């Protein structure tokens, strides 16, 4: 009887491994502060067609999608929690949440990207192909990550030494790469260019997996052929 139980147990493990091999995990991390309003309206129209295109190109994929909508530390202090949805196949649920977003808040120019990245590490990642997709027009906190005028700290970066209550963003990004999660970034504004250059440096320092698994695009269009091609190619390579 024990032998039969072990056979069933091993069979279940094999089935889960096979399922994970065909699974594709995509987590979208979106800045939902006031400055993102025009992009978010476009994003609402593009989100579902983007998923449909990925599913068309990878019909065998078990596509799981998660979502984090983040703002800034002062918004959290005011009780305005971030939107935080785990990886799921309930695309209608994600789509409804996205369509109900009303951008506001933000305070100073940088936003709490480090906090959003920390939340991303708690998602139920299981696929061989794991992608975190950051979309923002503002840099993270910290003087290393932007060239904003520091003579007006209250307006530019209230947390110039990063979040006093959380991890340094370098450590969080290293943790992301340590879980073999690919980082895709949509660069919407020149203010984020220095930050993305620093992310690339951190990525190269870790040397955890090939640099082709990190992807930056300067574009204001989420529903972009280049993005879809990159996701599909990565999935087919890692399946």
Outline where the language-model segments fall:
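Divalent cation-coordinating acidic motifs and surrounding scaffolds
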Residues: 1-239
């Amino acid at each position: 009887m024990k032998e039969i139980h072990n056979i069933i147990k091993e069979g279940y493990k094999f089935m889960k491994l096979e399922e994970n091999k065909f699974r594709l995990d995509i987590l979208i991390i979106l800045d939902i502060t006031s400055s993102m309003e025009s992009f978010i309206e476009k994003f609402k129209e593009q989100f579902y067609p983007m998923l449909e295109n990925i599913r068309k190109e990878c019909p065998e994929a078990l596509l799981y999608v998660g979502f984090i909508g983040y703002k800034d530390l002062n918004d959290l202090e005011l009780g305005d929690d971030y939107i935080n949805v785990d990886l799921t196949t309930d695309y209608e649920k994600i789509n409804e949440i996205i369509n109900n977003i009303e951008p506001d808040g933000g305070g100073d120019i940088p936003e709490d990207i480090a906090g959003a990245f920390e939340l991303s590490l708690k998602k139920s990642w299981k696929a061989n192909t794991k992608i975190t997709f950051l979309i923002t027009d503002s840099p993270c906190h910290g003087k290393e990550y932007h060239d904003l005028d520091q003579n007006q700290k209250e307006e530019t970066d209230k947390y110039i030494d990063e979040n006093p209550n959380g991890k340094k963003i370098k450590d969080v990004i290293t943790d992301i790469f340590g879980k073999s999660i690919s980082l895709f970034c949509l660069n919407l504004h020149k203010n984020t260019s220095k930050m993305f250059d620093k992310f690339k440096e951190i990525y190269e320092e870790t040397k955890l997996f090939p640099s082709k698994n990190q992807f930056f695009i300067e574009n204001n269009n989420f529903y972009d052929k280049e993005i879809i091609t990159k996701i599909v190619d990565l999935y087919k390579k890692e399946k």
